[in-house]
Structures are given as C-alpha cells and as structure tokens.
C-alpha cells in the first residue's frame, strides 16, 4: 500500500514500484467540501509533505488509472485508501462531509455509474466522533440512485482508539462489514518504541468468531525487518513509502508460499484468519 500518494504523477510512480494499493490524503474546507489531496507538515521522514492536487482532478486521474482500456490504466491498482483529514471539521459537519465526498466520488471517479474507476475504496476516518460521515456517504449514494456502489466501499477508523471503542463507533454508524483496521506510527519513530501490541489485538479480533474486523493493515513500514515482523503477526496489508521493499520481502522463501499481492479477483472484504 503506497503511502501519501497526493500528486497525480505519484499514482504511476508508486504502482511502478510495486504497489497494488495507494493511500491518499483528503483535506476539507470550512464548509466540509473535500478540497485537496494534501498532507502537509509534519509527515513521514524522507518525504516531501506538500505535494497536492485539487481533489476532483486527482479523482479524474485515479479513474483513468483504474478504468480498463484507458491509456493510463494500471491493472495492478485495486484498492485506494482515502485518509480523510477531517480534524478541522466540527463533529456536526461529519454527515455533510460524507455527503459531499460521495457526490464528488460519484461524479468524478465513478462517472455517475457509467464505466467509472473499478478500484475498491476504503474511507479512513481519524475521529470516532465523525461516524456520521459514513452515514452521510451511504445515504447520499442511495439518494443518487447508486446504492450498489457501496459494495466497493469499506471503512477504517485510523486513530489509536481501543478496539472496543472502534466497535462501538461502527455500531452507531450501522456498519456490519467491510472493515479494515489500521494501526501504526510515522516512520520517524522507531517501530520498537510503538510496538505491535495494538496490531496484534486487531488481528485477534479479526480471527475471533465475533470480531468486527475483516482486514488489518500496519503503517508506515519502510524497513525489511519491520515488514517481516508485521507479516509474522498475520496482517493483511502493509502501508509503505517503499513498495519495492515489501515486494522483495514477499519474494523471500519464508513468505512467498503464504503471502502474495492481492489482485482485482480477490475480495478485499473477505476475512482470512491465521
């Protein structure tokens, strides 16, 4: 999963390095409109934090990259995580943010349901109090006549809240599936300081008979040793600034029989247990 892909040209760059998924930051204006694909300072070490596009222009480029037959099409690119930088919004704006996000995706990415981009989408929300963003997104697609597109959409609460608190937020939002759970820390902090305890709890929830999690991914992993540690606990995805590092580890004898990069034929909402 290629991290912080916010300029159009970076789509090609990260896929060519081996990524089958990208993560893109989405900032909002004061009226809860998605405005830019932009991270800003601070960000991961050894990355330029200020690359950006207008959100709708990025969606159009992403659509071309994920539409079979287009000259810019990448068959390998099957999943996009939108990291929704909604920290500037009030809690009571979350529904509107979801509504406006859905309308933008419907028009500029899904092409109003007419041969739009085919990638699966994960809406990654940092604040549990913004669970109504999910509600606004779902209800808008239904109102606009395209409820079937929700089959392409999953969810992630990306804060470091307890697993139980996250489960409660999903309950409030009426979410019963298609859940990706993230865990991690910036690459500027040594991974051993943070540790894998919360990621292990997420994997345990995924593997339990009554868990809410379908997939677990870990970020931001740039080192070979940390990649192996994450794979050893059974995560489903790894977010990285260096997709070639992940690809190289997956080709090692200890991992190539158990793991592979997902393709479009794989179901990103299906649970695989340890």
Swiss-Prot record:
> What protein does this entry describe?
Dermonecrotic toxin LarSicTox-alphaIB2bii
Give the catalytic activity. an N-(acyl)-sphingosylphosphocholine = an N-(acyl)-sphingosyl-1,3-cyclic phosphate + choline; an N-(acyl)-sphingosylphosphoethanolamine = an N-(acyl)-sphingosyl-1,3-cyclic phosphate + ethanolamine; a 1-acyl-sn-glycero-3-phosphocholine = a 1-acyl-sn-glycero-2,3-cyclic phosphate + choline; a 1-acyl-sn-glycero-3-phosphoethanolamine = a 1-acyl-sn-glycero-2,3-cyclic phosphate + ethanolamine
Q: Name one GO molecular function term.
A: phosphoric diester hydrolase activity
Q: Which residues form a coiled coil?
A: none
As for subcellular location, the record says:
Secreted
The set of disulfide-linked cysteines is 43-49, 45-188
List the SUPFAM superfamilies hit by this protein, alphabetically.
Answer: PLC-like phosphodiesterases (SSF51695)
The lineage, from the top, is: Eukaryota, Metazoa, Ecdysozoa, Arthropoda, Chelicerata
The protein's role, per its UniProt record: Dermonecrotic toxins cleave the phosphodiester linkage between the phosphate and headgroup of certain phospholipids (sphingolipid and lysolipid substrates), forming an alcohol (often choline) and a cyclic phosphate. This toxin acts on sphingomyelin (SM). It may also act on ceramide phosphoethanolamine (CPE), lysophosphatidylcholine (LPC) and lysophosphatidylethanolamine (LPE), but not on lysophosphatidylserine (LPS), and lysophosphatidylglycerol (LPG). It acts by transphosphatidylation, releasing exclusively cyclic phosphate products as second products.
Cofactor needs: Mg(2+)
> Which family, according to UniProt?
Belongs to the arthropod phospholipase D family. Class II subfamily.
Q: What UniProt keywords are attached to this protein's entry?
A: Cytolysis, Dermonecrotic toxin, Disulfide bond, Glycoprotein, Hemolysis, Lipid degradation, Lipid metabolism, Lyase, Magnesium, Metal-binding, Secreted, Toxin
One Gene Ontology term of the biological-process aspect is: lipid catabolic process
- Its main subcellular localisation, reduced to a broad class, is secreted
Q: Which residues bind Mg(2+)?
A: 23, 25, 83
């Amino acid at each position: 999963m290629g991290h912080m892909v916010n300029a159009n040209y970076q789509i090609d760059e990260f896929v060519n390095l081996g990524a089958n998924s990208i993560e893109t930051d989405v900032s909002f204006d004061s009226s809860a409109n998605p405005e830019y694909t932009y991270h800003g300072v601070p960000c991961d070490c050894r990355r330029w934090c200020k690359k950006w596009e207008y959100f709708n222009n990025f969606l159009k480029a992403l659509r071309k990259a994920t539409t079979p037959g287009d000259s810019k099409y990448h068959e390998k690119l099957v999943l996009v995580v939108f990291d929704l930088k909604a920290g500037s919004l009030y809690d009571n704006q979350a529904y509107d943010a979801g509504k406006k996000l859905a309308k933008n995706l419907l028009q500029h990415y899904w092409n109003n349901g007419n041969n739009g981009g085919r990638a699966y989408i994960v809406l990654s929300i940092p604040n549990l109090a913004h669970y109504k963003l999910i509600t606004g997104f779902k209800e808008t697609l239904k109102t606009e006549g395209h409820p079937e597109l929700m089959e392409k959409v999953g969810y992630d609460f990306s804060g470091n809240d307890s697993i139980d608190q996250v489960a409660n937020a999903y309950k409030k939002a009426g979410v019963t599936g298609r859940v990706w759970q993230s865990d991690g820390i910036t690459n500027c902090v040594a991974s051993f300081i943070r540790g894998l305890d919360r990621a292990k709890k997420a994997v345990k929830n995924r593997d339990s008979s009554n868990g809410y999690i379908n997939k677990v991914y870990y970020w931001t992993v740039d080192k070979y040793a940390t990649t192996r540690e994450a794979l050893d606990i059974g995560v489903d995805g790894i977010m990285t600034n260096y997709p070639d590092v992940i690809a190289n580890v997956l080709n090692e004898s200890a991992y190539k029989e158990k793991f592979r990069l997902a393709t479009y034929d794989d179901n990103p909402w299906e649970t695989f247990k340890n």
